[in-house]
Amino acid sequence: MPQLNGGGGDDLGANDELISFKDEGEQEEKISENVSSERDLDEVKSSLVNESENNSSSSDSEQTDRRPRPRPDLESYEKQREYFAEALRRQQDGGFFKGPPYAGYPFLMIPDITNPYLSNGSLSPSTRTYLQMKWPLLDVPASAALKDSRSPTPGHLSNKVPVVQHPHHVHPLTPLITYSNEHFSPGTPPSHLSPEILDPKTGIPRTPHPSELSPYYPLSPGAVGQIPHPLGWLVPQQGQHMYSIPPGGFRHPYPALAMNASMSSLVSSRFSPHMVPHPPHGLHQTGIPHPAIVSPAIKQEPNGESPSNSTHGKPSVPVKKEEEKKPHIKKPLNAFMLYMKEMRAKVVAECTLKESAAINQILGRRWHSLSREEQAKYYELARKERQLHSQLYPGWSARDNYGKRKKRKRDCKSDSPSESNFSPQPKKQCVPYLSSEKMCDSPTSSHGSMLDSPATPSAALASPAAPAATHSEQAQPLSLTTKPEGRAHHNHPHFPLPGKSSGSGSGSSMALHSLSRPIPFTSLPPSLLGPNSPFHQAALHSHHALLQTQPLSLVTKSVE
């Protein structure tokens, strides 16, 4: 293989120098050149046949202008093609890939990337390893460089690999042309907007001939303009040439897009095999789809998995539906229910009340006011009702309905976890890790504001409902706690006062077993701070209740 001699300049060789490929695919290239020359002859013949058929069927001048002019001999055609090949070689000095002498070359010619024309930037070692694994024809050293002087805006990857972009005026059947980036006439519209096909040799628009759509390119009816790029492994398109293009392929207007991720991310496993349809031949598909095109399919994957996850919970649903399909057999009506059924319409007509409870009360009073003889009539009707019910449903029992009702209650309880299952015992174990000094630092927002006013604590805490509130409100943010010693043996705690507890030693010893609250004492009048005040008594009462159940806020603060 030819190696780079110097620092990788642009002028390492002549512009018109032909590079010899000493590659593993050299024999394939010779065979493919013969095949391509035969294909060129077939194209000339088919175009002549095409033109003669169209001229005989239609004399429209516009249509004849779109067809290629008849070539009298093959020599002028060969000169024209060689002229384009020479111009292309001079134009892409330092280009990424050199166009082959045959523009209709059906196979992908991968050149030697170590040729002296490649400069400015290099493949990373990880990319080089991947290329060697995937495409054994490429031997890419770390100093090999990639450059396309003609690409208007090469999209650079994160690993300094420039991505060659197609111009907009590119032949739509790009797999028929190996990577030749030649511009066609400026007046021609883009290939994805024009219905006709541009001739790769002359740039003259014409309609495709069936002979061009060879078995190498089995096309679907609407995918002529969306054939993927022949360098599908570098420019991320859906398929690779020589592979079938399904009708649901990725339809993007431009055949090449700037890659927005590194090569390693393109070849990563996140492109699952089901995103890219496999060719029917069983050939290995090396085309990697573009991330911007595949992203809708990736976004749909979690949605596609959700039905499979939801099916795990569905087997229980048919069981419930089967139970609901069973007819609910009501038990036979008793005497009072028969009386209500008969008299309810009369009571509703007499009274303006619409509530069912009030109507039932009126019917109950009237039932009790009836004499034995009047009630006996309804008891007889109830007996007949039971007999008829036993004939219709011989194996029926009232326990069936009650069992269903209990099952429904159990299902409702299992669906909604109850908060009453929290036991206060594990909460007390977290108390020794708390300090009362930290508790009293900042009063809480909701209850602290409630306790700021002098009248509110005495009224709220002295009421009999105060201890019940401490039981029910388990998540109250009051920082209430007891010292571990006081929780064990202290039964009559004293409410601490800032002045008195600091004055005497007995007061300080009692403060160890005291209840600490974030209550601003400055906002309370002195009458509420006395030992006989209702505020003090209510605090002691709530403290006894607190020794039994401690609020949830103590547990959460210990975790922090």
Curated annotation (Swiss-Prot):
PROSITE patterns: HMG_BOX_2 (PS50118)
GO molecular function ontology, one term from the record: DNA binding
Compositional bias (Gly residues): 1-11
Induction: By ctnnb1.
InterPro entries in the record: Catenin-bd_sf, CTNNB1-bd_N, HMG_box_dom, HMG_box_dom_sf, TCF/LEF
Region (Disordered): 1-77, 297-328, 395-513
CDD domains on file: HMG-box_TCF7-like (cd21996)
Chief location: nucleus
DNA-binding region: 329-397
Subcellular location: Nucleus
GO biological process: canonical Wnt signaling pathway; cell proliferation in dorsal spinal cord; embryonic camera-type eye formation; embryonic camera-type eye morphogenesis; endothelial cell fate specification; forebrain development; generation of neurons; head morphogenesis
Gene Ontology cellular component list: beta-catenin-TCF complex; chromatin; nucleus
Coiled-coil zones: none
Key words of the record: Activator, Developmental protein, DNA-binding, Nucleus, Repressor, Transcription, Transcription regulation, Wnt signaling pathway
Short name of any one Pfam family annotated for the protein: HMG_box
Biased composition regions of type Low complexity, renumbered to the chain: 46-61, 453-472
Composition bias, Basic and acidic residues: 19-45, 63-77
Bias type Polar residues, positions: 303-313, 415-426, 473-482
Assembly behavior: Interacts with tle3a/gro2.
Role, per record: Participates in the Wnt signaling pathway. Probably binds to DNA and acts as a repressor in the absence of ctnnb1, and possibly as an activator in its presence. Required early in development for dorsal specific gene activation and during gastrulation for repression of dorsal-specific genes in the marginal zone. Required for head formation and forebrain specification. Regulates anterior-posterior patterning in the neuroectoderm by repressing posterior neural fates.
Family, similarity comment: Belongs to the TCF/LEF family.
Name of the molecule in the record: Transcription factor 7-like 1-A
